[in-house]
A protein has these predicted regions:
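Helix C-cap/helix->beta junction micro-motif
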Residues: 37, 157-160
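Accessory beta->alpha helical hairpin/"wing" motif in late/C-terminal subdomains of nucleic-acid enzymes
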Residues: 193-196
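Serine-dependent acyl-ester chemistry module
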Residues: 1-152, 170-177, 182-184, 207, ...
Length: 260
């Protein structure tokens, strides 16, 4: 992790495009091999914590002048001061002014998302949460481009055995996602699911698995009866408060080191 912290990538770094291209090629090769072996496949979009995980890295563009950096920092501090005195509109306006200097600075978008959320402009808030993720200079969270590439790879394969499941859209529209932004209700930190997150994903995938394997199914309206409730599922798996505390402790230890 410390290595990555010293090798951050600006969101417009051309190497990112190279990674996406190789990712797409690898996906298609994998799908071809699975299709030849008659293996049914479910491919889910990648879900990450947008709301409750600030960007792990923010970078100004290479070659940004010292004057521009100085102007950006001055406006940034004005925004922080405005927010500190609860002048949210002024804070937003200062940050929008800073965006005119650098519109790809990740933590600027995250702060804007929080401010817009507090002023109940939820459309703008959602936009900037996503921008904060996509501009993260330490992209441990899957970007929007990753999921677009994933879906396009599935659509490019001429096979009825490869199925795409839009887990991201499902989680965005889940009642536990505040303002349609996945967050701490499902994740410990940037990507690792809480038990509730695992349960939510598994419950949504269940009927898709039945379908792709041609398993017998009840009527759609009755299908949910077969699913255990969260508490009962935890009991069957032996997941208890002690294990939950151990998970939380391990996540606390994880976040004491880089890149956090």
């Amino acid at each position: 992790m410390a290595f990555f912290h010293d090798h951050r990538l600006h969101p417009d770094d051309p190497r990112r495009e190279g990674v996406l291209n190789r990712y797409s090629e690898n996906l298609k090769d994998t799908f071809d091999a699975l299709t030849e072996s008659n293996v049914p496949v479910l491919v889910g979009s990648v879900v990450v914590n947008e709301r409750d995980c600030p960007p792990l890295g923010s970078l100004h563009p290479f070659g940004m002048s010292d004057d521009a950096r100085s102007d950006f920092d001055a406006i940034w501090n004005q925004a922080l001061n405005a927010e500190a005195r609860d002048d949210l509109i002024s804070a937003i306006n200062f940050l929008k002014k800073a965006m005119e200097i650098d519109a790809r600075f990740a933590k600027l978008h995250f702060r804007l998302a929080r401010l817009y959320e507090r002023t109940e402009d939820l459309t703008s808030s959602r936009f900037h949460y996503r921008q904060a993720k996509d501009c993260d200079a330490l992209p441990f969270r899957a970007s929007s481009a990753i999921n677009v590439t994933l879906k396009q790879a599935v659509e490019s394969v001429a096979s009825t055995s490869i199925h795409f499941v839009d887990l991201e859209s499902y989680l965005r529209n889940h009642p536990s996602s505040m303002n349609q932004v996945p967050g701490g209700a499902f994740f410990y930190e940037h990507v690792h699911f809480r038990f509730n997150g695992d349960y939510t994903m598994a419950s949504y995938l269940f009927p898709h698995i039945q379908q792709i394997l041609n398993l017998p199914r009840m009527e759609p309206g009755e299908e949910s009866v077969r699913l255990l409730e969260l508490v009962d599922c935890a009991k069957e798996l032996g997941y208890n408060p002690v294990l939950e505390a151990m998970m939380i402790q391990s996540m606390i230890q994880l976040q004491k080191g880089p890149p956090f």
